[in-house]
């Protein structure tokens, strides 16, 4: 472990504020060294944290935290904040079961003023806190720290519009590193890039001086014209139109400039906007060169960096989707792919390279992504929206109003369904089966293995209406996808094991744990495949020939597939004991996915235990 004598003296930000300003650069170096050592041993978000170190130090140095409120957007960049706020000795537990969360969490520290994990919430939350301070007569200051990637979301601009029209003492800091996870997209990003490149100004100034150098009056007039044009192009034009006092851009790695600027801003009244320019991965050469790969990392050697993983014999579900997307695009030129800023995470890198004109990254704009797809579907295209389960929640109205109500053929490829592990409850796909199956016209599918995933994606693409295929993070049971694509019968499951007495109706990722449990219980197992429409004939058949039905899903029990089975039985007037197994009615925290599933009783041992407890209880009620 690197020696960190100055950092060792900092337990809370009050200790930091006792330092001489001249000591802050040394603290930044030690904090960066500690961060590299820490994350290399635990894994986690990395490049964004390296880029936020100086800004974090300056904020805690100038502001009286925790009384003054720092509201972080997304939370990827808050490891330095956690280290400086009393959690340094727990950094070795980062994102592990029972350890520190990878994002700000209100019940973890009083310095974490707002829980977060999704993008673009900081300005709205900070405005609410600023209004609360005004209403209660408090003189506390409130700061929102938001990245340029998060500024592509409409929610951020809704909050800016509201905040700029208020008289609250709010500071919004734009941490501009020209990259959130994947490179940023859209007009706003091009606007920032054009401004920061300096080419326009450099060309204009050098050309003016060269051409008009011998004519001072004309040169002076040209400089006036330059200032007029510059005024039209600077970010101040945009943000001051929202009602903010714009300051910047400033170097986000110059502690002297940051501290001076923040001290001055802290004395100002009304909404302020500070544009800070940082470099993702700053101070660690490998991360500076490849910030995408170093955004989220597993354990690595600080000296050697990330090591390429050897090819796995089992392709992950994300890769299965990406391969299917390219294969399907080769067959049907109507296919277009849409992602809300998750090219790598959703498996669309190959598709972008092979079909750049049919690939659309709309930025962190889930609502727009869904309506954009609906418009494409209206006029003959076949859009596939690749999106995480947790982020589809942000576009629920568009899903209902713009797609399903009009019965448009949009395919939703829903990644990260179920528990996701280290990222915790903000990123878990715990609710999609419940919130999708209640929507008219929706067809909802849950594959049990890699090949079934490929075939159900094909089935979805052929369907003339809205469809969703949900699959978990990581690898499946190892069923090699078959190259040939075959549409599966809509709304039909398949009986995978014939037993007696007990029938397990398993959905998606729970099929293989159910099969293993059935070996111990001598139970029948149905791979239901479809959540909507359900295979009602198979349900009735199993109900008639078994004494207990067990539903198993990696989704909350409330409103999920178990509820759907009970509704089917009730509608048919069939009375049979039913045991519903799924995620509990509370948020499942971060940790190793296998351990979390075991805690929820959704591993093989848990299924066996629950069934035997039900049989021992001898209950005849659902």
UniProtKB/Swiss-Prot annotation:
Under the heading SUPFAM superfamilies, the entry gives: Thiamin diphosphate-binding fold (THDP-binding), TK C-terminal domain-like
Biological process annotations from GO: 1-deoxy-D-xylulose 5-phosphate biosynthetic process; isopentenyl diphosphate biosynthetic process, methylerythritol 4-phosphate pathway; terpenoid biosynthetic process; thiamine biosynthetic process
The answer to keyword Transferase applying to this record is yes
Would I find Aminoacyl-tRNA synthetase among this entry's keywords? no
The entry's free-text remark on the cofactor is:
Binds 1 Mg(2+) ion per subunit. Binds 1 thiamine pyrophosphate per subunit.
Where does this protein hold Mg(2+)? 148, 177
The pathway this protein participates in, as annotated, is: Metabolic intermediate biosynthesis; 1-deoxy-D-xylulose 5-phosphate biosynthesis; 1-deoxy-D-xylulose 5-phosphate from D-glyceraldehyde 3-phosphate and pyruvate: step 1/1
InterPro entries per record: Dxylulose-5-P_synthase (IPR005477), THDP-binding (IPR029061), Transketo_C/PFOR_II (IPR009014), Transketolase-like_Pyr-bd (IPR005475), Transketolase_BS (IPR020826), Transketolase_C (IPR033248), Transketolase_CS (IPR049557)
| The protein's role, per its UniProt record | Catalyzes the acyloin condensation reaction between C atoms 2 and 3 of pyruvate and glyceraldehyde 3-phosphate to yield 1-deoxy-D-xylulose-5-phosphate (DXP).
Q: What is this protein called?
A: 1-deoxy-D-xylulose-5-phosphate synthase
Which organism's genome codes for this protein? Answer: Laribacter hongkongensis (strain HLHK9)
Gene designation per UniProt: dxs
